Design a protein with these regions (language model features):
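Catalytic-domain carbohydrate-binding cleft regions of carbohydrate-active enzymes
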Residues: 1-248
Length: 248
């Protein structure tokens, strides 16, 4: 049966057009919502990156941080990318990008005992070919991105200037969904790609925090129950990319 992997996330620019305190408050609110959701619904998986947001939670709500650590151990909360922030990857120097990776990786190694192997550039407006070499030498096997925003999506092998290669996934349409429109995203994807064996659809309220909504989750569950052509799996990007690699 054809598979659609559903990646719930909540993109959040912590200091874009607002003060640090506001970004911090939104990050903690988003993490509270996601934590409650993971604990309530079996089979649901939440994904988030950016170690600075986890640091804020650890410093201000240690009990919430411990709950997240438990969810990570259970596989219900997945750490994406593992960077300090989700930065632009065209204008900054290679050294800057490496430091983003190193600082984030050290935090997740210390507090969660893991380092992700899939990097993301959901909101970066461009992706330098030189990034491939940096990712590979920093230990990443995979990369997922969105922009430029168009109907072209799917997996490919990206080769860097030095011959380094990385499994890469171009996402469909957008990384988040407005409240109540997750099923609309899935329907659009199925219409555009009815014959693909392995598929990825991202959802969750975001662009400035939010996370999963109960309406969307229940709508997705109902849609999945009535859709006989696809198996729907709440997952993270590494599971999707591994399935795509096996397929190709």
């Amino acid at each position: 049966m054809k598979k659609i992997f559903l990646v719930c996330n909540a993109h959040l620019d912590p200091v874009w057009l607002w003060q640090r305190a506001e970004g911090m408050a939104e990050a903690m609110a988003t993490f509270r919502i996601a934590t409650d959701f993971c604990e309530k619904y079996n089979g649901f998986v939440f994904n988030h990156n950016e170690s600075v947001l986890y640091e804020w939670v650890m410093e201000n709500e240690p009990e919430l941080f411990e709950r997240i650590k438990c969810l990570v151990k259970q596989g219900k909360w997945r750490i994406m990318s593992g960077w300090y922030l989700q930065p632009d990857v065209v204008m900054p120097s290679g050294e800057s990008i490496i430091r983003q990776i190193r600082v984030g990786n050290e935090f997740f190694r210390e507090h969660f005992g893991e380092i992700p192997k899939t990097a993301i550039g959901f909101d970066a407006f461009g992706h330098s070919r030189g990034l491939v070499q940096i990712l590979k030498k920093c230990g990443y096997d995979n990369y997922a991105y969105l922009r430029p925003r168009d109907k072209v999506c799917g997996p490919f092998i990206w080769e860097g200037f030095d011959g380094s290669k990385i499994n890469t996934l171009k996402l469909y349409e957008w990384y988040n969904t407005p409240k109540g429109e997750a099923v609309k995203r899935i329907e659009s994807y199925v219409k555009d790609f009815p014959d693909r064996e392995v598929n990825c659809v991202t959802w969750g309220i975001g662009n400035h925090g939010g996370g999963p909504s109960e309406k969307d989750f229940l709508d997705i569950t109902e849609f999945a129950d009535n859709c006989k052509d696809f198996e729907f799996i709440h997952a993270d990007l590494i599971h999707i990319l591994m399935n795509l690699i096996k397929l190709n």
